[in-house]
C-alpha cells in the first residue's frame, strides 16, 4: 500500500509534469473563443497555475510555478489542508495535465456557473472537467484588460447543471501574447463563418482564405 510519502511524491511529480505542459502550451499565449457573434479572450498567467493544482503552499504563486517548472519543487514546499484536501488534488492533477484540450478541442462555454463561493461569469468545459474563468482585475476590483484568467479547475460533472446556459464553441484562435493579432486557428466548426465582430482581432490571412 502506498505510504503518505509515496502519495505526496506522486502529487509532486504530477505538479511538475503539469507545470511543464502549462509552460509549453498555455503560458505566454492568448486564446480567442468565438461562439455565434460573441467572443472572449483568455490568457494563462504563471501565477494562476497554483490555483488549479488543488494544493496549498507558503511560496508565492510565481515561485511555486517556477520551482515546479524547473522540477525543483520539494514535498516540504506544498501541503494539504481542509480547504485543499489530498483527494481533491489527486482528482484535479490528471485534468490539469490535459488542460490544453480546452484550447484545442471542441468545447462548451458555460455562463454564470455557480459554486459554493463564487459565480463564474464564463467557464469552458469538455464535460469531463471545467475551467472557471475570472475577469482580470486589480486589488480594488477595477478591470485591467478584457482578458479572462483561469481561476478554478473543477472535475465534478455538475458544472453544466450549475450554469444558466451553455453554448458550443464555433472557433478557437491562439497567438503569442507578445503579438497583436491572432494568427493560429485551433478549432473551427466548418459550417460556420468567422463573424465580422472578431475580424479586427485576427490576422487577415485567417479570413481572407475563408470559404465563401
Q: Language-model segments: which ranges?
A:
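Compact beta-sheet-dominated globular domain cores
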Residues: 130-189
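An acidic, glycine-rich, mixed-charge low-complexity segment common to nucleic-acid enzymes
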Residues: 1-118, 123-125, 173-212
